[in-house]
């Protein structure tokens, strides 16, 4: 057995894609975005591992010192990050917009998995068109939901989160509903990934990963 065949065999055992399969989609980011509770981040991690490409969690980069330094002095940006006694972070949309642009500057022509927080679904008129252009620069953007029925999605995810011991305040309930609605509207026309099957049962992480891989272009 030659070395290349052995490497291919080991990759198959590990559940990784072959080089031929790797080349079958564009050198662009794969974006996963969705509200909390959809299993998006778990799926993103598993997808990156299976494709053997880097995982880039955008929420973490919002508090990364590199992006803070790049954006903190930009016009209109407000950001405060303290790291001495745990992490405290507050910012405005101008900062988030700046960081997302810098992330795309860094990764727009790379095969990476971008795990994008659901809070990045809402952008006011000053930024919405430019954000859509940014996200549409890759053909592989996947929105995690339960169904196109926003109430069904909300109730399913609320029940799942409460089942994990989370307490959702009335204020956060409204915010959560808005994120679900914003995702359905802001990213209209992109590929949707339902986290439940036809029998209304939750799909496994492996099932979600395989579904995404079959839809890569």
Model feature map: region roles:
Residues 40:
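Conserved lysine of the Walker
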């Amino acid at each position: 057995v030659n070395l290349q065949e052995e490497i291919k065999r080991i990759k198959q055992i590990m559940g990784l894609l072959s080089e031929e399969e790797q080349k079958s989609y564009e050198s662009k980011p794969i974006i996963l975005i969705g509200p909390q509770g959809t299993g998006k981040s778990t799926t993103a991690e598993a997808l990156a591992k299976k494709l053997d490409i880097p995982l880039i969690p955008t929420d973490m980069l919002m508090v990364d010192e590199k992006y803070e330094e790049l954006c903190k002095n930009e016009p209109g940006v407000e950001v405060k990050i303290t790291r001495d006694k745990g992490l405290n972070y507050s910012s405005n949309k101008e900062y988030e917009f700046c960081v997302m642009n810098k992330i795309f500057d860094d990764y727009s022509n790379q095969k990476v998995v971008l795990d994008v927080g659901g809070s990045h679904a809402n952008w006011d008129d000053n930024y919405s068109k430019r954000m859509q252009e940014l996200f549409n620069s890759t053909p592989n953007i996947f929105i995690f939901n339960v169904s196109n029925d926003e109430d069904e999605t909300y109730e399913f995810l609320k029940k799942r989160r409460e089942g994990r011991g989370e307490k959702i305040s009335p204020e956060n309930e409204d915010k959560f509903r808005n994120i679900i609605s914003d995702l359905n509207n802001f990213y209209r026309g992109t590929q949707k990934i339902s986290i439940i099957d036809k029998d209304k049962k939750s799909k496994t992480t492996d099932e979600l990963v395989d579904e995404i891989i079959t839809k890569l272009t």
